[in-house]
Amino acid sequence: MVCLVSRTGRQSQRYNKGRRQVVGCIPYRLKISSDGTISDEFEVLVISSQKGHALMFPKGGWELDESVEEAASRESLEEAGVVGNVERQLGKWDFLSKSKGTFYEGFMFPMLVKEELELWPEQHLRQRIWMKVDEARDACRDWWMKEALDVLVQRLSLLSLKPMEEDENLPLISIY
């Protein structure tokens, strides 16, 4: 069962030298070709901002009672209504919030989506849209999220050169 309430407030969030630490996730889905290689076609899931004027990847504050990977998973569930395998970190970015004028540390992770939920905590606040990578790069509001997407594309392109073995533990599935 999924909790249909998002965490709110900043009292239990992590800070480093005055910078709020936020964690984001790039939900994606792959296609595996018949010869066992990963197709270069994959899509990423973007969400609308709460006010609906911008597109981005799920992200939010990293809470004191969770690991960074747990935070990435929670944000994807709360904001985009997806669950899956959180993979190795894409990187850390320091950025300035245009609206608040404060600095943040942003950690980004890829998530191979295993399930899209029909009900999720912020479904009435946000839209979710599957896009091709180029479309998402153009649509995404934040430069640091675009850079994280480029890291993911590079990582997955390296995987696509290698045929999949049946006993490999890579969390790759075909959802097309």
Swiss-Prot record:
Annotated ranges, domain Nudix hydrolase: 22-153
UniProt entry tagged with the keyword Hydrolase: yes
Cofactor: Mg(2+); Mn(2+)
EC number, UniProt record: 3.6.1.-
PROSITE patterns linked: NUDIX, NUDIX_BOX
Range of the transit peptide: 1-21
GO terms for cellular component: mitochondrion
Pfam families: NUDIX
Keyword terms of this UniProt record: Hydrolase, Magnesium, Manganese, Metal-binding, Mitochondrion, Transit peptide
Extent of motif Nudix box: 60-81
Subcellular location, principal: mitochondrion
Molecular function per GO: metal ion binding; pyrophosphatase activity
Entry comment describing in which tissues the protein is expressed: Expressed in roots, stems and inflorescences.
Subcellular location: Mitochondrion
Sites where the protein binds Mg(2+): 75, 79
Family affiliation: Belongs to the Nudix hydrolase family.
Function of the protein: Probably mediates the hydrolysis of some nucleoside diphosphate derivatives.
The name this protein goes by in its record: Nudix hydrolase 18, mitochondrial
Lineage, opening ranks: Eukaryota, Viridiplantae, Streptophyta, Embryophyta, Tracheophyta
